[in-house]
Regions:
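Rossmann-like NAD(P)(H) cofactor-binding subdomain of soluble oxidoreductases
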Residues: 52, 62, 70-145, 149
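NAD(P)-dependent Rossmann-like dehydrogenase/reductase catalytic/cofactor-binding core
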Residues: 7, 12-16, 218-286
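Small-residue helix-packing motif on alpha-helices
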Residues: 45, 73, 209-216, 238, ...
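Short pre-catalytic strand/loop immediately N-terminal to key active-site residues, enriched for Gly-Thr
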Residues: 128, 177-183, 235-240
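Internal alpha-helical scaffold of NAD(P)-dependent oxidoreductase catalytic cores
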Residues: 116-126, 142-180, 193-230
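NAD(P)+-binding Rossmann beta1-loop-alpha1 motif at the extreme N-terminus of oxidoreductases
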Residues: 6, 10-68, 72-75, 141, ...
């Protein structure tokens, strides 16, 4: 029944796809809000969370059904989004083993591999692994997705529709690259925040007050990002256009190069990817 409804909803491009969220934290709330903004009915969305506060907050804010346990009504969905913490996933999935039909199960838990999730679900394979990032909380995220080979085109489209509610999506062909997704875009906002923090500190060191320094840092970063998105040129070309020979920008960039800025960024992202692989090994242990 769920599989037939999923196929029908995708083929007709309507908004009647039934979606249940296992976990009601910030990312689940962002997805629910984004889906409603995209035209999904609150009546087609449900959330399951042990926290009474979380349930009350979701019900009050979005008008969705929010329950403490995954009952039959919540399980009668086309898509099940796993939005619990990675360390809690195994225990959360135990009651689901053997109860799933053809639902597309989407995991947004960092580090967890589909083989482990599928094993905890009793050999289930209709699985999609995703890595959103925190700008999804304001609908400006980017999410990398990987689908188990058994997931058909309709299932992939269903997963894509869910995650595109909070930003852009990028499909990854090899699950091993999901650790790289985590390193580049999942952790990426922290790198940008660190840059903003440093630019603000530099502004204050030059005499601006906190409010002025923050405004310069924030709006410069935002404007540069918007320009890069809007331009057909590469970031390298845009950088070169700002850099006049013998000018202030060249002096700044030469200082950054001398400090090892480029190599430090490469090393940081590589460290994040390596840690992601380690976490996958640790989290997947029985």
């Amino acid at each position: 029944m769920a599989a037939a409804r999923l196929q029908a909803s995708l083929l007709t491009r309507d908004k009647n796809m039934k979606i249940t969220f296992l976990g009601g934290g910030n990312m689940a709330a962002a997805l629910i809000g984004g889906l409603i903004e995209k035209g999904f009915s609150a009546g087609d969305l449900q959330a399951v969370d042990l926290s009474a506060d979380s349930r009350e907050r979701l019900a009050a804010r979005f008008g969705v059904r929010a329950v403490e346990a995954l009952d039959e009504a919540a399980l009668a969905c086309d898509v099940l989004v796993l939005a619990v913490k990675p360390q809690q996933m195994k225990a959360a999935l135990a009651p689901l083993a053997g109860r799933l039909g053809k639902q597309i199960v989407i995991s947004i838990a960092a580090g967890l591999r589909l083989a482990d999730i599928g094993r905890w679900l009793g050999g289930y394979t209709q699985l999609v692994r995703c890595m959103p990032n925190t700008p999804a909380l304001i609908g400006a995220g980017v999410t990398g997705l990987y689908a188990d080979p058994s997931v058909d085109a309709a299932g992939r489209e269903a997963a894509g529709r869910v995650l595109s509610a909070v930003g852009s999506i990028v499909w990854i062909a090899d699950e091993a690259r999901m650790d790289a997704v985590t390193a580049v875009s999942g952790s990426g906002p922290a790198y940008v925040f660190h840059f903003i923090e440093s630019l603000e500190a530099a502004g204050r060191a030059l005499g601006f007050d906190e409010q002025q320094a923050r405004r310069f840092a924030l709006d410069t970063t935002l404007g540069a990002a918007r320009l890069a998105v809007a331009s057909e040129e590469s970031p390298a070309v845009l950088r070169e256009r700002v850099t006049s020979k013998g000018g202030t920008t060249q002096a700044a960039l030469e200082s950054l190069a001398a400090s090892g800025w480029h190599d430090a960024m490469l090393a940081a992202v590589a460290a994040a990817e390596a840690r992601g692989r380690e976490l996958g090994d640790e989290l997947g242990k029985d």
